[in-house]
């Protein structure tokens, strides 16, 4: 099975982190468990790194990069950019929660969205 991103994530090398999260699906912890895309290369239409796709565009309501959306606002409890949220999006791979996408440093097994983008966008 997939090991939990046993952290701190900072102990991982960038390569290791990107390998672990590659292919993970991002699921919100809202009542609908809204799909927020996949952690895959930017050519994948479902990728959070595809700026023209549903999940990578800063204009899409289901994109974490839309700062005015439920899932991108730093004030929304479901957003990975909310540094105080206890309900950030889950990273799910092979049917298991492997970690969380969150700017809240108190969340175990989490990586901040901007860090994930900086480390992995060009590696996947």
Where are each of the predicted segments found?
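Repetitive, compositionally biased segments used for assembly/scaffolding
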Residues: 14-124
